[in-house]
Amino acid sequence: MAEAKFEPAKDAIPGVIVMEERVKIKDDVEIEISQREDRRYEVTVKGPKGEVTKEFYYPDVYLWVEDDEVVIAATRSNRRQKAILGMIKAYIENMQKGVTEGHEYKLKLVYSHFPPEVKVDQKEGKVYIENFMGENVPRVAEIVDPENTEVIVQGQDIIVRGIDKEAVGQTAANLEQATYIKDRDPRVFQDGIYIVEKDGKKIV
């Protein structure tokens, strides 16, 4: 049985709004907000590159679309609520960026003696790192949401791009984790795959 959803409205909020954040909706973006019977908000952001949907639920926090803005409001005023409002605002801004520009992480394959070979199976949603540290069994990293997250290998450079920042970031983290070397001195054994750039910001 399908769960009922309804469009949230400011007038239906039980209490007085004491704090709010707003996100300007871009011209080429459509944002839909619905609320389930359990009060969880479902936010769908659609743009030229696709659409992303996320759920939000925090007590005393309310979301709705007002004209060309998303309003994120709270009926309590404290540091925690302020942080939650800021976090949701950042999520929605990242969702807008994803469906208009996309998100991109860059990684570097580092090795000293054994040149690994990185193979991407986009359909299967896996990345295979063969001959890593001379190992016979390939190491495997999962591509999160492979239909919308792409992994590209260009020599020792690896690019992860997609519309969902969380999926892109987690895929990059999976690649790092897959080549983690246990019980070895990292000052000596620096082989691995490392994130070097996140959405244009270099990692020192």
UniProtKB/Swiss-Prot annotation:
GO molecular function term, any single one: structural constituent of ribosome
Keyword field contains Metal-binding: no
Keyword terms: Ribonucleoprotein, Ribosomal protein, RNA-binding, rRNA-binding
GO cellular component, one term: cytosolic large ribosomal subunit
Xref: SUPFAM superfamilies: Ribosomal protein L6
A single BP term in Gene Ontology: cytoplasmic translation
Family according to the record: Belongs to the universal ribosomal protein uL6 family.
Record's function text: This protein binds to the 23S rRNA, and is important in its secondary structure. It is located near the subunit interface in the base of the L7/L12 stalk, and near the tRNA binding site of the peptidyltransferase center.
Subunit structure, as described in the record: Part of the 50S ribosomal subunit.
Protein name: Large ribosomal subunit protein uL6
Organism of origin: Methanopyrus kandleri (strain AV19 / DSM 6324 / JCM 9639 / NBRC 100938)
Organism classification: Archaea, Methanobacteriati, Methanobacteriota, Methanomada group, Methanopyri
The gene coding this protein: rpl6
